């Protein structure tokens, strides 16, 4: 879901 993407991006960024 979008939340998963946000969490992944937030983790990388």
Swiss-Prot record:
It is found in: Secreted. Has no antimicrobial activity. Inhibits the formation of NO by neuronal nitric oxide synthase (nNOS) at micromolar concentrations. Acts by a non-competitive mechanism, probably by binding to calcium/calmodulin and as a consequence blocking calmodulin attachment to nNOS. In vitro, does not exhibit cytotoxicity towards 60 human tumor lines. It comes from the Eukaryota. One of its GO terms (molecular function) is calmodulin binding. GO terms for cellular component: extracellular region. Belongs to the frog skin active peptide (FSAP) family. Its main location: secreted. GO terms for biological process: defense response. This is Lesueurin. Expressed by the skin glands. It comes from Ranoidea lesueuri (Lesueur's frog). The modification Alanine amide is found at residue 13. Keywords: Amidation, Amphibian defense peptide, Calmodulin-binding, Secreted.
């Amino acid at each position: 879901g979008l939340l998963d993407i946000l969490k992944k991006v937030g983790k990388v960024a």
